[in-house]
Amino acid sequence: MISGWLHTVPGSTKVYDSSGNVIPLVGINVDGLDFGTGNPATSPDPCGRGWGIPTTSFANVSKWGFNFIRIPISWGNLEPTAPTLLANGTWTHHWNTQYLKELDTVTYQFGRTHIGIIYDFAQVDVSAAFQQAPEKEQGGECEGWGNPIWLYPNITSPTTVPQMTAALCNFFNDRSEVGNKAPAPIEAMEAAEQMLAARYATNSTVIGIDMFNEPWSDSTCGSPTAVGNLFTGYYTKMGQAIAQVNQHLLLVFEEPPPGLMTSSPVMTSPPAVANAIYSFHIYTADWASAQPYVQAYLHNAKSWGVPVWMGEFNAFEAGCTGANCKLDSNWQTDTQSLLNFCNTNGINWAYFSYYSLGTTVQTPVPHNQILALLQGEIPP
């Protein structure tokens, strides 16, 4: 359980509570609030999507022995309507009050059992504006999710990879695709993340914000190092904006996952913010292919003096919920090796996701087998 704010210490790879105790973060992702175009699942959009969360998770996460959760949300759900420019030159934002009330409920429910929450600003295929995209893990999605549709008025369906690459490159370069009809994209997203951080500035259940899920681009945006520098600049700007309204939060900055770019890691320095946590995701075929990446991320974390967190993994496809699952035949041994390495080296972790543990969604391996393995790896 987690009670109260957490923090980092410059030069240390640990996370601490207010009493100075080291707190290993071991948890799971509870997703579902990232889907849709501002609408709840009870009123699905044309792709059948909408936001919602499995309510059984409120009790199960604590009962299973985890101490925190990562909850993917989306800027598109927070702000489905574009901001309005006032006569005085300032922007008025139109936040989704129904969605915010749902986040309040979720925060309250997990807070009752002392489960810390890191809200993740998720994206897959950039935005719901990008439809029928060739998404790499799940074999294609009717629509993406993440950034709001109004950022991308000129996207047509079916979406192509070059369109998504250009959109992400423009985003991290703070180049607008809507002209003066909205703030520059990073500034617009800053407003959303600041709003959420301020909303929970006195609520210690919300322990952090994951500032951008799985950033990526390709050579059209520059060399891997140049793209990594763009990411560092973005995280610095976003983290400083969040800290202006809430200095308690852990600020998570992610590398691109292996496979989304030709190389990973690409970052050569951390963002210039306090309470930063370095994060990576692992969706490789097995432990042998994962280990070089994990070691590289760990090396960076130690060099920079920041904690490191494996923010997503699915036990080498044991928990895959998509159409093209490729289960590692040695998934148990490989997952144990992965988590043993993490625990031995102080790498925090969060399994993805609750849907393959506490719902009826089909997975290649029975849910109880996955859960038992994860529980066996929770540090005492």
Predicted regions and their residues:
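Substrate-binding cleft of secreted/luminal carbohydrate-active enzymes
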Residues: 26, 287, 291-380
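Aromatic- and acid-rich polysaccharide-binding/catalytic face
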Residues: 207, 265-289, 307
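A structural micro-motif
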Residues: 115, 204, 249-250, 274-276, ...
